[in-house]
Amino acid sequence: MQAALPIRSRLLHALRSFFHERGFVEVETPVRLAAPALELHIDAEPAGDHWLRTSPELHMKRLLAGGLEQIFQLGPCFRRGERGDRHHPEYTMLEWYRARADYTDILADTKALLAYCAQAVLGRTDLVYRGQKIALLPRWERLTVAEAFQQWAGWNPVTQWDAERFDLDLVEKVEPNLPREVPVVLTDYP
């Protein structure tokens, strides 16, 4: 833990620097809410007669609608009952929005952000995750969900939707087969 805290501190500094250098405004939105966001698969944590936020999205979108064109937030979020390799009930979330940006713009932001932070924290633009070296530059693999499922699960969820089968096949058939040496983005979720 002692070794991780200075790295976390450098990462948080790099995240803020990335957005500040690009003209984003850092915002803080409420953590304790009168009512939880209506999320089908996400349970909010109660806090007395209020709820802890699961995401700052709703309040940030109000700021965006109010005229702030580029905003970001780093802060605590809470999700009840989520604990595992990829989930913890309390965590720090980064969320950002740009007026008039589409998902390809946000994907470009993400690519630049990860390379920027890796360089700032590690001194290079590649990293090792679970023993696998991942090059953050120059290219990222990009597949549609339909392409990935057709290739590794043998069906197309865009034309044959089955929510239970989708979740199971994503975890058991698609994710294990995705390339490991570069970041992979699945687009066009049904």
What does each model-found stretch correspond to?
Residues Y116-P190:
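Metal-assisted phosphate- and nucleotidyl-transfer catalytic regions
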